[in-house]
């Protein structure tokens, strides 16, 4: 059963400007492993975190580091959730978090589906 769905899009260039203009923003949004990725990948990961927040009902007190995107050997993105995000997911009865990322033509996008 579907528990929640979220989608988000990010303008890659504008996101890059925000990261460069705001000291510490990269560290607030991304884990050290995520932060090593190129800009388009960071934008897609931010879109995924925003989409996850929407799917969870925009929980108060959500910490960005509690939703980390890792890649399986195949390259498939997967969320590793913990802390505030895991608590909210458990409250909603989430058993699986599905995520799809894309970036092309200067736009990054992500879709998240929460399943019981």
From Swiss-Prot:
Transfers the 4'-phosphopantetheine moiety from coenzyme A to a Ser of acyl-carrier-protein. It comes from the Bacteria. Belongs to the P-Pant transferase superfamily. AcpS family. It catalyses: apo-[ACP] + CoA = holo-[ACP] + adenosine 3',5'-bisphosphate + H(+). Keywords: Cytoplasm, Fatty acid biosynthesis, Fatty acid metabolism, Lipid biosynthesis, Lipid metabolism, Magnesium, Metal-binding, Transferase. SUPFAM superfamilies: 4'-phosphopantetheinyl transferase (SSF56214). Pfam families: ACPS. Gene3D superfamilies: 4'-phosphopantetheinyl transferase domain. It is found in: Cytoplasm. GO terms for biological process: fatty acid biosynthetic process. The keyword Transferase applies. Its EC number is 2.7.8.7. GO terms for cellular component: cytoplasm. GO terms for molecular function: holo-[acyl-carrier-protein] synthase activity; magnesium ion binding. This is Holo-[acyl-carrier-protein] synthase. It comes from Nocardioides sp. (strain ATCC BAA-499 / JS614). The keyword Lyase does not apply. Mg(2+) binds at residues 8, 50. It is an enzyme of class 2 (transferase). Its cofactor is Mg(2+). Its main location: cytoplasm.
């Amino acid at each position: 059963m579907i528990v929640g769905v979220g989608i988000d899009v990010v303008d890659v260039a504008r996101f890059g400007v925000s990261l460069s203009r705001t000291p510490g923003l990269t560290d607030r949004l991304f884990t050290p492993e995520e932060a090593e990725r190129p800009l388009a990948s960071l934008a897609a990961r931010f879109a995924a975190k925003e989409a996850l927040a929407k799917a969870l009902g925009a929980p108060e007190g959500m910490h960005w580091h509690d939703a980390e995107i890792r890649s399986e050997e195949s390259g498939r993105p997967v969320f590793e959730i913990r802390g505030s995000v895991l608590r909210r997911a458990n409250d909603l009865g989430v058993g699986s978090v599905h995520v799809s990322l894309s970036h092309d033509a200067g736009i990054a996008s992500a879709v998240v589906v929460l399943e019981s």
